[in-house]
Amino acid sequence: MSSAGGGGGRGKSKGSKSVSRSSKAGLQFPVGRIARYLKAGKYAERVGAGAPVYLSAVLEYLAAEVLELAGNAARDNKKNRIVPRHIQLAVRNDEELSRLLGAVTIAAGGVLPNIHQTLLPKKGGKDKADIGSASQEF
């Protein structure tokens, strides 16, 4: 009367495959690894079951957001490969990401192109005759 393999008992049957917590949550980021890091980091005495899943989801969302914007920046520059410069442009041109990563320095990222308003040429309606005659009057 014992169940040999797939019967009505509790627990796993012998033929069942283990399913990762990442796949259960529908995530690409590793839930188990993040749980291990949370436990080893001594951030708290105990770590709840949902905490690493939630943190994995947040990290995956942020990574996807940055990669999407960096891919757009690479495409705008007619490149197929994302380099640190594209990540820098993506982060600094997005208001929320720029605020979140304000104190972060991206290696080989460069700076945003910016020319101060006072250094730009004036858009006045003067023609060339007016410019030359004004400097000659004493």
Curated annotation (Swiss-Prot):
Phosphoserine PTM positions: S135
One example of a Gene Ontology biological process annotation: heterochromatin formation
Record's keyword annotation contains RNA-binding: no
InterPro entries per the UniProt record, alphabetical: Histone-fold, Histone_H2A, Histone_H2A/H2B/H3, Histone_H2A_C, Histone_H2A_CS
Subcellular locations according to the entry: Nucleus; Chromosome
Subunit structure, interactors included: The nucleosome is a histone octamer containing two molecules each of H2A, H2B, H3 and H4 assembled in one H3-H4 heterotetramer and two H2A-H2B heterodimers. The octamer wraps approximately 147 bp of DNA. Interacts with numerous proteins required for DNA damage signaling and repair when phosphorylated on Ser-135.
Pfam entry (one): Histone_H2A_C
Transmembrane as UniProt keyword: no
Residue ranges the record marks as coiled coil: none
Signal peptide boundaries: none
Highest taxon listed in the record's lineage: Eukaryota
Organismal lineage: Eukaryota, Viridiplantae, Streptophyta, Embryophyta, Tracheophyta
Record's comment on post-translational modification: Phosphorylated to form H2AXS139ph (gamma-H2AX) in response to DNA double strand breaks (DSBs) generated by exogenous genotoxic agents and by stalled replication forks, and may also occur during meiotic recombination events. Phosphorylation can extend up to several thousand nucleosomes from the actual site of the DSB and may mark the surrounding chromatin for recruitment of proteins required for DNA damage signaling and repair. Widespread phosphorylation may also serve to amplify the damage signal or aid repair of persistent lesions.
GO MF terms, alphabetically ordered: DNA binding; protein heterodimerization activity; structural constituent of chromatin
Composition bias, Gly residues: 1-10
Domain description: The [ST]-Q motif constitutes a recognition sequence for kinases from the PI3/PI4-kinase family.
Name this protein carries in UniProt: Probable histone H2AXb
PROSITE patterns in the record: HISTONE_H2A
Chain's role: Variant histone H2A which replaces conventional H2A in a subset of nucleosomes. Nucleosomes wrap and compact DNA into chromatin, limiting DNA accessibility to the cellular machineries which require DNA as a template. Histones thereby play a central role in transcription regulation, DNA repair, DNA replication and chromosomal stability. DNA accessibility is regulated via a complex set of post-translational modifications of histones, also called histone code, and nucleosome remodeling.
Motif ([ST]-Q motif): 135-136
Keywords for the protein's UniProt record, in alphabetical order: Chromosome, DNA-binding, Nucleosome core, Nucleus, Phosphoprotein
